[in-house]
From Swiss-Prot:
Biased composition (Low complexity): 300-315
Annotated membrane topology: Peripheral membrane protein
Gene: LSP1
Tissue spec: Activated T-lymphocytes.
Protein name per the record: Lymphocyte-specific protein 1
Keywords carried by this UniProt record: Acetylation, Cell membrane, Membrane, Phosphoprotein
Record's comment on post-translational modification: Phosphorylated by casein kinase II, protein kinase C and MAPKAPK2. Phosphorylation by PKC induces translocation from membrane to cytoplasm. Phosphorylation by MAPKAPK2 may regulate neutrophil chemotaxis.
Organism encoding this protein: Homo sapiens (Human)
Compartmental location: Cell membrane
Chief place of localization: membrane
Amino acid sequence: MAEASSDPGAEEREELLGPTAQWSVEDEEEAVHEQCQHERDRQLQAQDEEGGGHVPERPKQEMLLSLKPSEAPELDEDEGFGDWSQRPEQRQQHEGAQGALDSGEPPQCRSPEGEQEDRPGLHAYEKEDSDEVHLEELSLSKEGPGPEDTVQDNLGAAGAEEEQEEHQKCQQPRTPSPLVLEGTIEQSSPPLSPTTKLIDRTESLNRSIEKSNSVKKSQPDLPISKIDQWLEQYTQAIETAGRTPKLARQASIELPSMAVASTKSRWETGEVQAQSAAKTPSCKDIVAGDMSKKSLWEQKGGSKTSSTIKSTPSGKRYKFVATGHGKYEKVLVEGGPAP
């Protein structure tokens, strides 16, 4: 169980120490390279002094090799997340450099004489290529940093700014809430007597009342005049509804003629009603049709009798007399024969 618990801690440590080890390896490689370069420069200067003060210019390949190591760590850095297990050559170099540093011996660098022996034909065209080398140096010095370098610089600057902001936020003192302040004040202050508590309470109540009064004053006044008018109208409506409605007297209409005036006076006196009662027939068997026929007989009178009388060829005259409802009787008319 102890081994299982210690394994994850060791893995975490290895993950944390990975980038630091990578950075330390790169720093050591740069230091070794700089030492080798300084030794080469010293040996070249010593040879030049012995040879009569002529300073041979470094060949083009050496200049390019001297420029490459400064760019190599940035390209191989991979922002601290490279897998060093896939680079056995670099690991061997790192182990060799560490052994040299631990033993205290200076790092072994190839002498320029050996390089000249390996490359005997380089001095022949040193003078010819010197101008080209100077131009390339100037162009390389004038060229700005590559896009990868600028991206890495921007990322590094952004990360540094974010870290500074987080650090400032952590260092900023938090503003305590009013409840916490009240609690601290109450704890720091000595215990108050009941009279002081009552005084404080009354003062707070008075302040709240003053605030409420100020709010009420700021509110607009209600239209009291309109309310009074509405009350008056309401009371008047109640009074008029409670009273019994009086019949309005109609204006007298002028009667057009004297006949109407006489009938009016007769109605007022009651003569018309008496006359109508007297005119009503006593017999209840009479129908409206019979009454109309009776009126016709009365109006025409003798003309009807003359018309109903008929003469026969014998010279006698007869007439029909109504004996009942729809019944007539033939009666001989006394008198001489028809003319």
